[in-house]
């Protein structure tokens, strides 16, 4: 039918066009059938399907397989190839890598090949990666990316054809450029441009000559004169009249042919036309337009004075060429005709339009540049994020953290455990004893006397003696070296200072600048402040050094040129060269406040007496008098006399008292003219003596006062305090007399409590009424009514009577005023307040003393022990017998007819289970426990906290309850126990099943956790295996009576050396005292 219809249609229309396809009537969409799944009629498709290729399978596929080699081009050949290898090694294991080099020059060409191999799972890559997948990942991740600012291309190169073709192209390009570079250097004759192209001047002028000349020109090819290199011979500046350019001088960047190409790559981001060069420098030429000038300005702003290899590009900008103005001005100047007003207006408006256009171009170029930079920054940031996410390895990061921590700990251990002990051992004074003796340095461990060493930081001894700081024993045993004694040097510029500043107060505290001793070691820094002296002695030494005038801080007039002149009279024994143990070494400065200063320690005086005879024998002089109580400096200089008879004997202390002030004044006046040569020195000396007479009276009184103490107590204890002087006693008497007599009632001498309360005071309404309180001290009833509501007590007298009656019933002595308390429970704090005692740990043994139930059990146990002691029976046997009799009586009472019927019924059920199951008896008992649980309850225990009690009689060997909790491992149990202790949970219920399993019933479990410990328990815990799992079940160890507490032995390990053992509170006769 269809064919007939087509023929008839053709005959009617007389049209040879083919009929339309009905399947294309609706655009090829057929709604009446799903052509994708049913194929009675197919959809018309003009092109075949693009089928997805089959995945390569090495077992079934043929051919070489997917490519595993890639070629990388575009990276900088000057960078280390290891960086490029490290980047591509992150995608898989590299089997082979090759950085292509030039076969002739050996230089790298900037492209390389990487062949990947199949990798096995490792620590860094837990998933295996095939070589084809690694190559695919490398192309997908690195194609078009940057490696150190250079964009690279990554492509497949399965057989190495691409890399070989690239190498051949590089070689061919080198062969083509080599003859061109060498051709200009071959000819040695004159340059071609100097040779005339026509015939010589002597040639004939006829037409033949012309024809012959033309034939010669055509036959001989003369090359066009062009520059032999990139560097132009003619100046370039003559061709840049209007073009904007940037000039870089040759003094900043040397002119070389190879530099132009590098400069073009350096400035490739700027739209320049060309870079030309001559002998003067480089010319970066831009387009003669507003856009070109904008690019020139941008290039100048960005690249001026930047690094170019090892040079600095110093640029000079020329926006309008060498003329320095716009090109349209030059074009308008060439026109000679006069302009019409309209033309003149147009010409005048043209610069403004050009300026506006150039400004718009500059703004557009600036916006484009900002957008481009922003896009590049964002792309770089995203690339950096991807690289960080790709290269992030938690194992490496953890390794770095651990290494840093180990380094810190190692440095800390070396500093504290190795360096510090070694330094302390090296600086130990014992190791430098010989060197100190050789250099005459003091012994740091020797008992230093505070008044002797007045300043440790001076570079000289206190009285300029040779060995005043050396060991006293060494000074006694060493040979006397007279030449080693120091010479008293003059004070530099002493007279100049006197003339400059006028009169100098000899008693002023002008301490000279102290310099460090050359032989000062650092061991004194390591010495403790408390070594060799107490805190009081350190304070006294500090105050003494601060308030007194030390020998080195005295005026230099006493040891100046006057002493230098008299030095020769005594040969090398100067009058001021005394030993450190003589009286001169203890001379203190003359100050107005010496009456209030501390006296010499009695220990120093004892040392003076002990060393007196030895010093006389050592120095060969006789010391007449030794002032024991602050002798003056002048007396100490006069006391050294030539040796006489009996000089080696020790004189009595009483004969060494200081003479009267008049005698000293006379001697000083006689001796002063002989010593003084200048009038100014004499005046200073007289003024000093006048002040000394006032101080000598104070010294005499103190010496007489302490004379008895010196003779009776030769070696007093260091803790004894010096007696007060007469002046101080008189002042104290005057103060006592001056105190006014005050009324004891108004101004009591002792502190009295503001509100005295009786010893039996208790806070109550009646007690408040008994206190002597004023109207302001009584409670404000109006304010109390506002804060609290009114209570309904009906009859007030009845309410008071009922309250007193309750107190009488609760009290032990039947008194309503005695508070209800437990004896021994409330223990007062030593300071009266627990907060004032600080934070301290309370031991378990101390905590158990304050438990009320334990106090009750303790009293019962003491009474029972006392009773057992009277009967002379063993306490353990007596307690066991009593428990057995009580259990038998209770069991006899409990065996009623109902219990016997229940037992028979349970026995019958048990026999049935044994016959059907044939299991162990423990399992049957456990099943019995599931059927009928023993009625138990928990309540306050007399042993500890809560306890579990039996609500009925329980026979022996009967199962009571299962210990239920959370099953955890041993390590988790230890962590939880520490966590419970830190969080304040005092009781943790952990029951061990075996070495690896623990039942934790602290937060999840049954009431079996409340069973307390006892040294004589009535229950026992067994571990049985039910259906493949271990269970903890509590059995009755003996017959248990109703309302009796259930206990079993915790069986803790013994800790005999522990300082905080857990006390046992069971109170039985066989109590061991501790759980652990």
UniProtKB/Swiss-Prot annotation:
Residues 330-377, 544-561, 683-704, 720-742 have a biased composition (Basic and acidic residues). Residues 174-210, 325-387, 493-599, 623-744 are annotated as: Disordered. Keywords: Chromatin regulator, Chromosome, Methyltransferase, Nucleus, S-adenosyl-L-methionine, Transferase. GO terms for molecular function: histone H3K4 trimethyltransferase activity; RNA binding. Its main location: nucleus. Residues 934-1051 form the SET domain. GO terms for biological process: methylation. One of its GO terms (cellular component) is chromosome. The keyword S-adenosyl-L-methionine applies. Its EC number is 2.1.1.354. It catalyses: L-lysyl(4)-[histone H3] + 3 S-adenosyl-L-methionine = N(6),N(6),N(6)-trimethyl-L-lysyl(4)-[histone H3] + 3 S-adenosyl-L-homocysteine + 3 H(+); N(6)-methyl-L-lysyl(4)-[histone H3] + S-adenosyl-L-methionine = N(6),N(6)-dimethyl-L-lysyl(4)-[histone H3] + S-adenosyl-L-homocysteine + H(+); N(6),N(6)-dimethyl-L-lysyl(4)-[histone H3] + S-adenosyl-L-methionine = N(6),N(6),N(6)-trimethyl-L-lysyl(4)-[histone H3] + S-adenosyl-L-homocysteine + H(+). InterPro entries: COMPASS_Set1_N-SET (IPR024657), Nucleotide-bd_a/b_plait_sf (IPR012677), Post-SET_dom (IPR003616), RBD_domain_sf (IPR035979), Set1-like (IPR044570), Set1_fungi (IPR017111), SET_assoc (IPR024636), SET_dom (IPR001214). It is found in: Nucleus; Chromosome. S-adenosyl-L-methionine binds at residue 1050. It comes from the Eukaryota. A motif (RxxxRR motif) lies at residues 900-905. Residues 1060-1076 form the Post-SET domain. Residues 512-525, 668-682 have a biased composition (Basic residues). Pfam families: N-SET, SET, SET_assoc. Belongs to the class V-like SAM-binding methyltransferase superfamily. Catalytic component of the COMPASS (Set1C) complex that specifically mono-, di- and trimethylates histone H3 to form H3K4me1/2/3. Binds RNAs which might negatively affect its histone methyltransferase activity. COMPASS recognizes ubiquitinated H2B on one face of the nucleosome which stimulates the methylation of H3 on the opposing face. PANTHER family: HISTONE-LYSINE N-METHYLTRANSFERASE SETD1 (PTHR45814:SF2). Component of the Set1C/COMPASS complex. The RxxxRR motif forms an adapter helix that bridges the nucleosome and ubiquitin. This is Histone-lysine N-methyltransferase, H3 lysine-4 specific. It comes from Chaetomium globosum (strain ATCC 6205 / CBS 148.51 / DSM 1962 / NBRC 6347 / NRRL 1970) (Soil fungus). The lineage of its organism: Eukaryota, Fungi, Dikarya, Ascomycota, Pezizomycotina.
């Amino acid at each position: 039918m269809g064919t007939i219809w087509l023929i008839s249609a053709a005959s009617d229309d007389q049209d040879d066009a083919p009929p339309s396809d009905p399947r294309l009537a609706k655009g090829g969409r057929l709604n009446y059938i799903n052509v994708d799944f049913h194929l009675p009629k197919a959809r018309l498709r003009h092109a075949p399907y693009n089928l997805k290729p089959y995945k390569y399978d090495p077992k079934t596929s043929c051919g070489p397989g997917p490519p595993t080699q890639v070629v990388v081009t575009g990276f900088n050949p000057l960078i280390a190839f290891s960086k490029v290898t490290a980047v591509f090694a992150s995608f898989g294991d590299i089997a082979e890598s090759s950085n292509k080099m030039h076969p002739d020059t050996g230089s790298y060409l900037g492209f390389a090949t990487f062949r990947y191999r199949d990798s096995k799972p490792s620590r860094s890559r837990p998933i295996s990666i095939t070589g084809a997948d690694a190559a695919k990942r490398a192309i997908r991740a690195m194609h078009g990316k940057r490696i150190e600012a250079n964009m690279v291309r990554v492509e497949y190169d399965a057989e190495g054809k691409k890399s070989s073709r690239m190498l051949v192209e590089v070689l061919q390009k080198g062969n083509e450029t080599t003859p061109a570079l060498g051709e200009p250097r071959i000819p040695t004759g004159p340059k071609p441009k100097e040779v005339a192209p026509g015939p010589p001047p002597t040639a004939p002028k006829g037409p033949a000559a012309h024809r012959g000349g033309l034939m010669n020109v055509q036959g001989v090819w003369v090359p066009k004169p062009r520059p032999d290199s990139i560097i132009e011979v003619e100046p370039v500046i003559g061709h840049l009249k209007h073009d904007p350019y940037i000039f870089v001088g040759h003094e900043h960047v040397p002119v070389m042919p190879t530099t132009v190409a590098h400069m073009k790559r350096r400035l490739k981001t700027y739209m320049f036309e060309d870079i030309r060069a001559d002998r003067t420098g480089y010319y970066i030429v831009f387009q003669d337009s507003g856009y070109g000038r904008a690019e020139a300005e941008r290039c100048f702003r960005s690249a001026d004075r930047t690094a170019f290899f090892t040079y600095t590009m110093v640029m000079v900008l020329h926006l309008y060429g060498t003329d320095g103005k716009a090109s349209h001005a030059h074009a308008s100047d060439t026109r000679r005709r006069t302009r019409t007003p309209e033309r003149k207006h147009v010409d005048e408006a043209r610069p403004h339009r050009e300026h506006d256009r150039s400004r718009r171009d500059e703004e557009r170029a600036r916006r484009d540049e900002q957008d481009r930079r922003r896009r590049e920054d964002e792309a770089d940031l995203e690339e950096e994020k991807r690289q960080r996410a790709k290269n992030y390895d938690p194992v490496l990061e953890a390794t770095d953290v651990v290494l840093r921590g180990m380094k810190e700990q190692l440095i800390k251990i070396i500093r504290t455990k190795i360096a510090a002990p070694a330094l302390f051992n090296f600086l130990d004074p014992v190791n430098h004893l010989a060197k100190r003796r050789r250099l005459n340095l003091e012994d740091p461990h020797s008992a230093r006397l505070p008044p002797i060493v007045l300043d440790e930081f001076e570079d000289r001894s206190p009285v300029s003696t040779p060995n005043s700081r050396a060991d006293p024993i060494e000074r006694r045993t060493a040979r006397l070296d007279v030449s080693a004694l120091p010479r008293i040097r003059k004070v530099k510029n002493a007279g100049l200072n006197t003339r400059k500043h006028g009169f100098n107060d000899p008693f002023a505290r002008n301490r000279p600048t102290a310099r460090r001793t050359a032989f000062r070691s650092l061991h004194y820094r390591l010495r403790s402040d408390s070594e060799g002296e107490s805190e009081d002695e350190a304070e006294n030494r500090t105050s003494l050094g601060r308030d007194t005038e030390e020998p080195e801080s005295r005026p230099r007039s006493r040891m100046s040129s006057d002493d230098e002149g008299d030095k020769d009279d005594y040969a090398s024994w100067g009058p001021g060269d005394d030993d450190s143990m003589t009286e001169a070494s203890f001379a203190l400065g003359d100050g107005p406040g010496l009456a209030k200063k501390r006296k010499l320690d009695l220990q120093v005086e004892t040392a003076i007496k002990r060393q007196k005879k030895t010093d006389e024998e050592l120095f060969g002089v006789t010391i007449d008098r030794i002032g024991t109580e602050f002798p003056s400096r002048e007396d100490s200089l006069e006391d050294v006399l030539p040796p006489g008879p009996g000089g080696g004997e020790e004189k009595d202390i009483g004969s060494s008292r200081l003479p009267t002030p008049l005698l000293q004044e006379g001697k000083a006046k006689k001796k002063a003219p002989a010593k003084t040569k200048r009038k100014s020195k004499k005046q200073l000396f007289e003024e000093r003596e006048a002040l000394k007479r006032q101080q000598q009276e104070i010294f005499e009184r103190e010496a007489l006062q302490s004379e008895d103490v010196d003779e009776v107590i030769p070696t007093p204890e260091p803790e004894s305090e010096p007696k007060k002087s007469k002046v101080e006693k008189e002042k104290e008497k005057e103060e006592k007399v001056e105190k006014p007599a005050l009324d004891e009632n108004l101004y009591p001498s002792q502190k009295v409590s503001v509100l005295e309360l009786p010893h039996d005071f208790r806070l109550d309404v009646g007690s408040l009424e008994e206190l002597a309180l004023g109207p302001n001290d009584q409670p404000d009833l109006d304010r109390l009514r506002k804060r609290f509501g009114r209570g309904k007590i009906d009859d007030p007298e009845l309410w008071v009577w009922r309250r007193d009656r309750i107190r009488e019933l609760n009290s032990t002595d039947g008194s309503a005023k005695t508070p209800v308390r437990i004896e021994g429970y409330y223990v007062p704090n030593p300071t009266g307040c627990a907060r004032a005692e600080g934070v301290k740990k309370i031991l378990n043994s101390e905590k158990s003393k304050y438990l009320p139930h334990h106090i009750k059990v303790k009293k019962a146990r003491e009474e029972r022990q006392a009773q057992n002691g009277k009967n002379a029976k063993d306490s353990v046997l007596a307690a066991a017998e009593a428990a057995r009799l009580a259990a038998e009586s209770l069991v006899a009472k409990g065996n009623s007819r109902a219990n016997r019927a229940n037992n028979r019924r349970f026995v019958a059920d048990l026999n049935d289970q044994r016959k059907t199951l044939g299991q162990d008896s423990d399992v049957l008992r456990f099943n019995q426990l599931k059927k009928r649980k023993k009625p138990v309850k928990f309540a306050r225990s007399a042993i500890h906290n809560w306890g579990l009690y039996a609500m009925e009689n329980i026979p022996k060997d009967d199962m009571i309850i299962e210990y239920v909790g959370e099953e955890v491992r041993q390590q988790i149990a230890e962590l939880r126990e520490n966590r419970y202790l830190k969080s304040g949970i005092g009781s943790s219920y952990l029951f061990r099943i075996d070495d690896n399993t623990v039942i934790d019933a602290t937060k999840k479990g049954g009431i079996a956790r409340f069973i307390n410990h006892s040294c004589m328990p009535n229950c026992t815990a067994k571990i049985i295996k039910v259906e493949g799992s271990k269970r903890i079940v509590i059995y009755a160890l003996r017959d248990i009576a109703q309302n009796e507490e259930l206990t079993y032995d915790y069986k803790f390990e013994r800790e005999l050396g522990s300082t905080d053992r857990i006390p046992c509170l069971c109170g039985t006769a066989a109590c061991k005292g501790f759980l652990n």
